[in-house]
Every structure is written in C-alpha cells, then in structure tokens.
C-alpha cells in the first residue's frame, strides 16, 4: 500500500545507480533497474525530487518506507542518503541499499 502523507518513515530503501546514458543499462545501474521493477510491480512512481534524489513514500508490511534513487554518482550517494536519514531520524540499521 502506498501513501501520500508527509508523516515520518521507519526505513529508507536506496536504489543506487549512476546518472546518464553511459551507465543506463549496465550493472552499475542495478539499483535503478531494480527500482524500475518496484515501480512497475507496485504501481508507485519514484519521481519526487528531494534530498538530491527521486523519492516516493510507501507502506510495506505496516512500515512507512522512503524509496530513493539518488541523482548523484554512486560514490556521492551519501549526499542524498544522509540528509534524508537525518530528516526522518532513520538509524543506519534501517537503511537498505540496492546496488551492483
């Protein structure tokens, strides 16, 4: 189930990839490719620009989750993840990263 309210989230799910056509269908974009499957299968759009990332909120298993596709290169993904984790007060053990 997906929601649109602005309440807190308990988990961050971060789909890592690199911007640009050079990496579009490579293993370096495994996280982005996984996010595309999640969007299709769950009917969610990860398209709200926030925290240097495309984001969407979802409720999965009764837990509020922020889905993130950082719009930085993988090596700089902390620029997106750290502010989101701080804003929502999500501890590191509640951050799931999907990458190659």
Give residue ranges: language-model regions.
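Nucleotide and nucleotide-moiety/phosphate-recognizing core
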Residues: 1-99
């Amino acid at each position: 189930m997906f929601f649109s309210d602005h309440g807190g989230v308990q988990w961050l799910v971060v789909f890592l990839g690199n911007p640009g056509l050079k990496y579009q269908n490579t293993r370096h974009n495994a996280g982005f490719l996984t996010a595309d499957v999640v969007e299709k299968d769950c009917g969610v759009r990860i398209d709200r620009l926030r925290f240097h990332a495309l984001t969407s909120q979802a409720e999965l298993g009764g837990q509020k989750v922020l889905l993130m596709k950082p719009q930085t290169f993988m090596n700089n993904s902390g620029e997106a993840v750290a502010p989101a984790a701080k804003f929502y007060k999500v501890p590191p053990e509640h951050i799931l990263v999907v990458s190659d």
